[in-house]
Each structure stands twice: as structure tokens, then as C-alpha cells.
A protein has these predicted regions:
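Active-site recognition of the HExxH zinc-binding catalytic motif
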Residues: 148-164, 178, 182
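Bacterial Sec-dependent N-terminal signal peptides
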Residues: 1-23
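Post-HExxH zinc-binding segment in Zn-dependent metallohydrolases
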Residues: 168-207
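Metzincin-family zinc-dependent endopeptidase catalytic domain
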Residues: 87-134, 138
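Pan-zinc metallopeptidase signature
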Residues: 211-297
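Zn2+-dependent metallopeptidase catalytic core
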Residues: 47-81, 85-88, 92-101
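Acidic/histidine-rich, surface-exposed loop or edge segments in extracytoplasmic proteins
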Residues: 32-51
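Short pre-active-site segment immediately N-terminal to the catalytic Zn-binding motif
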Residues: 128-149, 163-169
Length: 297
């Protein structure tokens, strides 16, 4: 039976086509990979053991954190592939995704490749300036971005497969996965968020989006364009920061209660905002107002 595969591109879920679980397994098995045993079976392009081990370590630790907290059991596999072995049959190199119990991550890229892949030329000058001011390296920033989004992808697995929640729209589906990731990093590896937050701040403040409304995100999704889509995700990080101050470790359990899988209700953005703001004193509404002001003249 064929199942629709959903891909996330730095948090981006795109339904590309119907690909059976066995086909995804076959595509990965066609690659010549080495393997790391452990709690999470990890397959990687030869020559990239170090980064594969880093991904395996952080994903394993995040799984332990959430299994202990939620009394659930994760069952995922990890593929870490370079540009030559990337699953171009599914999506171009540079994008990480979750599908059918696989977390598919790349082995990284240099700064030039990062800027070009994600269309960040217009904010490069500000990125350079902030990296220099903060005494952080571009390599550290890129690594932190992929680490954070590796757990974001794990969040999609958790919310979709293991939780009692059903995200009411694309916006909630994405920021809830980022919350899942950030809760782990806030509590276990807070320093890893420093250069990630630097990037999100520069992207949020200096990229000029064509689209900035929640309705645009829900309707156009990937169609907003990769740079604009990434800008949305950078903004989602700051929404998560607001929400964490309100909910801390209780957000996901509250999310399950407010947006249960059994629900058949169609919620508007206003409905969702009111629900989230029950404990946040209007901060979510304020965040949306600021977000949507970016394209208002």
C-alpha cells in the first residue's frame, strides 16, 4: 500500500508524491553507507562518521529525554548523507526531512553553500557582522541549525505518531515541532542554541519577505519560496520563546489537550491564538501582529 510521504525542509513538510515505505528503504539501501549501531541505527556516507555520530548522539539523547517524560517508545532510523548520495529522487540536497520513521539529514555544507542553498544573499552582510560581533563561527552556526532541526524532525514524528495531538493547520504543525526541539535544547544543551538564535534573529530582522501572514503560510506553504519559508521558521523560534515562558515543559501536554486527535473541529487562526493565549496574556496575538506587519505598507 502506498502512503503519502511528507518531507520537512528545515522544518518544511512537503507532500511530493506517494512513495511506499519500502521504496524509501530501498533508496537508502542503494547507497553505499557505513553503519553506526546503538539505540538509533545510523547509516552514513563513508568519510562522515564524526558528524553522523554527533547526530546519533543528540537524537538518542532527545529520545531518552522524551521517552522518560512521556512514557512512550520511539522507533526511528537515521540517515546522514552527503551531496553525492543524497536522495535527489525525493528532494534536492541541503534539506533535512522526516518520513516513514526515517530522519534524513545531510553531512553539512560550507558557508557559501549555505548562503546559496537557502537564498540568503540579502542578509549575508548582517550575518557576517553579527558572527564577528558575537565571536561565533559560520561553521558553528550552520551546525547548530542542523542540530536543532534534526530534533524538529523528530518532533514531527513524535506529534504525528506518538502524541495524542493533531495539529489543526500547517502553522501549528511547524511551530509545535520547533517547540519540541527547543524544549530539549533549553533543558539539556542550552549553549547549542546561541548561534542558532543569532541566525534566527538576523533572518527575522533583515530578510524582506514577500509573504508574512499566517494565512499565506497555511495556503502557500512551500510555495512561499525557500528563503521566505525559512524566514517564517526563524520567526517561529521566537514564538516558541514566548510560549516557553508561559508553558515551559507543559506545552506539549497542553497541546494534546487543546488539539486532540479525536477533534473534528475546524479552527481559525483566531481560535488557535485565543487557545494559546490562555496562559500567555496576548503574547501570541502580539507576535502575529508583528509577523504580519512585515508586508504591510
Amino acid at each position: 500500500m502506498k502512503a503519502k510521504i511528507q518531507l520537512t525542509t528545515i522544518g518544511l513538510i512537503i507532500s511530493l508524491c506517494s512513495i511506499a515505505q519500502s521504496k524509501l528503504d530501498s533508496l537508502i539501501n542503494l547507497r553505499t553507507t557505513d553503519k553506526l549501531d546503538g539505540r538509533i541505527q545510523t547509516y552514513y556516507t563513508p568519510g562522515h562518521k564524526d558528524i553522523a555520530l554527533e547526530f546519533q548522539t543528540v537524537v538518542t539523547d532527545a529520545i531518552k529525554y522524551y521517552e522518560s517524560k512521556n512514557s512512550v517508545q520511539f522507533n526511528v532510523k537515521l540517515a546522514v548523507l552527503d551531496s553525492n548520495q543524497w536522495l535527489k529522487e525525493i528532494y534536492p540536497y541541503g534539506f533535512v526531512f522526516y518520513s516513514n520513521d526515517w530522519l534524513v539529514l545531510n553531512t553539512g555544507m560550507d558557508y557559501e553553500g549555505f548562503i546559496n542553498t537557502y537564498g540568503l544573499q540579502t542578509i549575508r552582510q548582517q550575518l557576517d557582522k553579527e558572527l564577528k560581533r558575537s565571536k561565533l563561527t559560520a561553521d558553528d552556526m550552520i551546525k547548530s541549525i542542523f542540530m536543532v532541526y534534526s530534533i524538529h524532525e523528530l518532533g514531527h514524528y513524535f506529534i504525528g505518531r506518538l502524541s495524542k495531538a493533531k495539529s489543526p493547520d500547517k502553522w501549528t504543525n511547524e511551530f509545535s515541532a520547533t517547540y519540541f526541539s527547543c524544549e530539549y535544547f533549553y533543558n539539556k544543551r542550552p549553549r547549542d542554541l546561541e548561534s542558532f538564535e543569532l541566525f534566527c534573529q538576523v533572518d527575522k530582522d533583515h530578510y524582506s519577505p514577500k509573504y508574512s501572514s499566517i494565512s499565506d503560510f497555511n495556503e502557500k506553504y512551500a510555495g512561499t519560496g525557500i528563503a521566505n519559508y525559512l524566514w517564517y521558521h526563524s520567526n517561529f523560534y521566537f514564538l516558541v520563546k514566548h510560549l516557553y515562558k508561559c508553558y515551559e515543559k507543559e506545552f506539549i501536554s497542553n497541546y494534546e489537550k487543546e488539539f486532540p486527535k479525536s477533534s473534528t473541529s475546524r479552527l481559525s487562526t483566531t481560535d488557535i491564538t485565543d487557545i494559546l493565549d490562555k496562559n500567555c496574556k496576548g503574547q501570541v496575538r502580539q507576535w502575529i501582529t508583528e509577523l504580519e506587519s512585515k508586508t504591510k505598507h
